[in-house]
Structure formats: C-alpha cells, structure tokens
Amino acid sequence: MKFIHTMSTKSLAALMPLVLFPAVMAAHPVPASPLWLTYPGGEGPGKGKHIVLIAAEQEYRSEQSMPMMAAMLAKHHGFDCSVLFAVNQEGLVDPTRPVYPEKGKEAEFKPHSIPGLEYLAKADALIFVARLLTLPDDQLKHLVEYFDSGKPIIGLRTANHSFRSVLPYQMDGKPVNIGDILGGSFMNHHGNWQKDSTRGDIVTELKDHPILTGVKDIWGPTDVYRTFKEGTTLPEGCTALVLGQPLIGRVQGGADNPEKEPLPVVWFKGWKTSGGETAFVLQSTMGSAKDLENPGLRRLIVNAAYWGMGLKDKITSESSVDDTGDYKPLSSGFNYANIGVVPRPPSDYR
C-alpha cells in the first residue's frame, strides 16, 4: 500500500519558511525581562554563541558601558548578549546603594542582588564589572558554577574586588577568592586616583598575539591599579599584554608621571577548574565606562572574547568595534548628585 500525501500546496507554502530559514526561529537564550537586557545577535562569527555581561558596581558607570558592549557584540559580531545588573528592591539599577552597612545598623543592611545569574548556565563567555558586593548564597552559587565551568572569564576594572561575600568555592580544601581566579586583587591606586590617567603600552614581545590584533592607542582617564606587592610581579601563569603608564592629568597624550613606573593593566592566564578543565581568563584593570570610549581597549576585549571561545581564527583588525548608538557615559565617581546618577530601570540603558 502506498501512502498518499494529501497536504495542500497552500499548507506546503506555509511551512517553507520553517524549512528554509530555521535560523529565524531561533530564540535568544535568555527570556525578556524588565530586570535585564537582551540583544539578539546579527550576522557574524559569533552567531549561535551567547555572552553574558554583568554591570554591578558603584563608581565606573558599568551600567552604561556593558549595554554598549553588548549592543556592539550583537550587531557587529553576531553574539547573542545579555546584560545583568545589580538592582535594588524596586528592581532599579542603583549604583548609589551602599557597599557597607551603616555603623550600628548592620542588621538592617540588605544584600545586593543580580537577577538572572541562573542564565550563566547558558553562557559561552562572561564579561563583568563588579565591586564589593554582598550577594545571597543562591546567586553566588550561579557565579561559582560558571567560574568552575571552564568557560572564558573576562574581568574589567573593579572585577578583581567584586565581592565582600566569601565565595562558596574551594580548591584542594582551600577557599578560592576572585583574585585567585583573575590573577590578582586590588591593593591600592598606583596612579593618583581621579587625577592621573593611563596610557596602555603593548608589551613588545607580545605585539603579535592575536588578542592584540588591530589594537593601538590605548588610553583611559582612570588611574593604574596595583595588584601585587612592590618588588614582586604578577602571579605565576599570568602573561601581561599591556602595561599601564600613569600620566599626569586626565588628557590623552599627557606627560608620563616620572614618579610612577608602568605596571601590568591587561593580562591573561588559565584557571584550572575542579573538573580539570582550564578556563581562559583575561583581566583588564582598565575598563571604566570612560575608558571604554577608547576603541583600542574595546577591540582588545572583543578579541579576547573571540580567543576565549575558540574563535581566534576569526579575529581581524577589520571588524567593527564602533558603538551602535550615541555613547556618552557619565563621569566616574561617587558624587552621584553632581554626576547625575540616580536609580533607573534597566530599559533606560538600552
């Protein structure tokens, strides 16, 4: 007996887009929510991969820079991107929330919150800026699971002192902190805070590394961080890509500060997980929203994301790192009223 197909021509026509163009039906890996932002990837080498970006600090306007980076990575490079924010109890992005409890009112202190961290399980890479957070255990759990997944980790500026909370993470019976993962924690300002700026000088021996493809003229108005004691250097296994020379004043092209030696501001390393995998890690202590007006720094971060996700053959100096809108971030600092920083819904940062 033969099976006779009786589907009409009209029905077949209705199904053709699903057969010929299945990609248009692919959903973003993170559902829409008023608590975060999602950016579907366009065409590009990152098609089918998902980057989570986290903005969770109080000083450097990551609530503006991470959406800019996400939109650029989605539009010009094809990555699906999601931006998660530290929000207050009303669900507003609130950099003005205190880091430390008021003396005598410790019991009233509310932990910080980053909704959506469970979607790190669907991420192929993480780019984050965070500072001195106290997070609930269930949120720390999602972060630790990602840190121990073997997937790439890119930390910017204050990421190396992300948490006041102790991470529920141990290796060989010893507690792991974020500085162990990133290759050093903030110790002090090597440059003069809010007075010096930083010129990024590429390490000559590494100038041909793929992460530095097309990278030039790195400069930012933030100062250099010291992440290791004087007389020592980066921890074993870290490879410096860029040295930060403190400059007098906050204008690109300013004079070197003769009293300040250059220190590493960008390096990469491996992080060996409990399962024996090695995650690619890049730390840039440059990375304020104002720093990320610099196309050289943006390109370095994009290249690092490609490298970490196994797309090093797709790195090119011709790819676009232009922002997709009118990126004019507010100044860094804690004088929120003068700067114009107030709690806002995530949608304001799209």
How does the language model describe each region?
Residues L37-E43, V52-I54, Q58-G155, A159-S162:
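Helical hinge/lid and interdomain linker segments adjacent to catalytic or ligand-binding clefts
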